[in-house]
Curated annotation (Swiss-Prot):
Family per similarity comment: Belongs to the UPF0352 family.
The species this protein was found in: Pasteurella multocida (strain Pm70)
SUPFAM superfamilies referenced in this protein's UniProt entry, alphabetically: YejL-like
Pfam families membership: DUF1414 (PF07208)
Protein name in UniProt: UPF0352 protein PM1884
Lineage of origin: Bacteria, Pseudomonadati, Pseudomonadota, Gammaproteobacteria, Pasteurellales
InterPro entries named among the record's database cross-references: UPF0352, YejL_sf
Disulfide-linked positions: none
Length: 74
């Protein structure tokens, strides 16, 4: 999703593959998968990000997600 990241592609791909495997294990349809992923993002923001930064980070995340989805359409 991110153009530039401080994390290596290998590390990101490994975590992504683990998360996909969990969703497949539970045979989660797209809507349930999105609910779970959304709840995970919310939990990360609430538990790990200061109150003053949450909205800004949530906006940056949603903008990056929209940019990624729009890029996939072309």
């Amino acid at each position: 999703m991110a153009k530039n990241s401080k994390y290596q592609d290998k590390q990101v791909d490994a975590i992504l593959n683990d998360m996909i495997a969990v969703l497949e294990k539970h045979q989660a349809p797209v809507d349930l998968s999105l609910v779970v992923l959304g709840n995970m993002v919310t939990n990360l923001l609430v538990s790990s990000v200061g109150t003053n930064q949450r909205i800004a980070l949530a906006n940056a995340f949603s903008e990056a997600l929209l940019n990624s989805v729009n890029k996939q359409k072309s």
